[in-house]
Amino acid sequence: MRFVDEVTFVVRAGDGGDGCVHFRREKYVPRGGPDGGDGGRGGSVYLEGDEGLNTLVDYRHDRFFSAESGEAGGGRQCTGRSGVDRILPVPVGTLVMDEGTGEVIGDVTRDGERLLVAAGGRGGLGNLHFKSSTNRAPRQSTEGTAGESRELRLELQLLADVGLLGMPNVGKSTLIRTISAARPKVADYPFTTLYPQLGVVRYEAQRSFVVADIPGIIEGAAEGAGLGVRFLKHLSRTGLLLHLVDGVAEEERGGDPVADAQTLLAELEAFSPELAQKPRWLVVNRLDALPEEMRAERVAEIARGLGWDGPVYGISGLTGEGVDRLCGDIMNDLEARRREEDGETA
């Protein structure tokens, strides 16, 4: 299925039904009073979170969605039937904006959560409401009001605890395959990952976290080069970023892992200073390609070259070396953050 993370379309709620002008007419009651009923309300349009969806592709071609209008009122004080609401399923993590004004309408962050995006019109009043001591037979009623209509912009921002950052071919996809049930494509050429991938890491019973892998970032990404920049927004909700570098880039392709890491950080800051301020851990990958006696020094060498003062890990996503320790520390860090947040909101 094609991954689509931005769409625009128009929604229109149903109009309210008109009020009714009607008089009571029964045997032996030739001149009964007014009994016109109210119109039914128009159906509203809602977006509903669905954890089974991970793309907005269903809204790529359909550009208009409407709810049902309410029916007119009837005699004998019968209220018209209300219009049926329109429910549009969207992936959890969908940000909803008014395309015309730029207003943020809301954020769908939970499965089953509903967000009202267009309210149905109110039903009109029947002539029963206009009876008075001076007007016993009113012939007036009101029309139903129009339902809301607006153009929406939806942006999907995947919900993940941890984001993987790196240049193309540093082994992000291999790592996410090793630690989770996700199965992204793995191959020895750039941009194997074309779309964001999510993986659930089950560290122990009842302990898990979600990892997001996006296409690799290259120099000039903030100006649109490569594939990764348009997906960086999917890391905006993460609590922790893992900055992966290739520990054998120099030996295998004459690369410089320190320069690569500096390039990625510069692109990250150019795209979003706020994203660049998120906690980041340095992860030196592909150590299995080095002799065992060289691995620790290679990790330390890269960390020194970057002036890195945060956590540093040496791993092999292919063989699993160092991965258990990394996942355990991630789990503990995330749980500590959650406890801290719970304490602040208590």
Curated annotation (Swiss-Prot):
GO molecular-function terms, A-Z: GTP binding; GTPase activity; magnesium ion binding
Sites binding Mg(2+) sit at S173, T193
InterPro entries, from UniProt? G_OBG, GTP-bd, GTP-bd_Obg/CgtA, GTP1-OBG_CS, GTP1_OBG_dom, GTP1_OBG_dom_sf, OBG_GTPase, P-loop_NTPase
Q: Where is the composition biased (Polar residues)?
A: 130-144
Which cysteine residues pair off into disulfide bonds? none
Query: What keywords sit in the KW lines?
Result: Cytoplasm, GTP-binding, Hydrolase, Magnesium, Metal-binding, Nucleotide-binding
Q: What is its EC number?
A: 3.6.5.-
- Residue ranges of the Obg domain? 1-159
Q: Is Ubl conjugation a UniProt keyword of this protein?
A: no
Which portions of the sequence form the region Disordered?
A: 128-148
Broad class of enzyme this protein falls into: hydrolase
Tell me which residues make up the OBG-type G domain: 160-335
> Where does this protein reside within or beyond the cell?
Cytoplasm
One biological process term from GO is: ribosome biogenesis
- Cofactor or coenzyme needed: Mg(2+)
Q: Which SUPFAM superfamilies match?
A: Obg GTP-binding protein N-terminal domain (SSF82051), P-loop containing nucleoside triphosphate hydrolases (SSF52540)
Q: Which GO terms describe its cellular component?
A: cytoplasm
Q: Where does GTP bind?
A: 166-173, 191-195, 213-216, 285-288, 316-318
The record ties this protein, via NCBIfam families, to: Obg_CgtA, PRK12297.1, PRK12299.1
Outline what the protein does. Answer: An essential GTPase which binds GTP, GDP and possibly (p)ppGpp with moderate affinity, with high nucleotide exchange rates and a fairly low GTP hydrolysis rate. Plays a role in control of the cell cycle, stress response, ribosome biogenesis and in those bacteria that undergo differentiation, in morphogenesis control.
Return the similarity comment.
Answer: Belongs to the TRAFAC class OBG-HflX-like GTPase superfamily. OBG GTPase family.
Assembly and partners are described as: Monomer.
**What HAMAP family does the record tag this protein with?**
GTPase_Obg (MF_01454)
The protein depicted here goes by the name: GTPase Obg
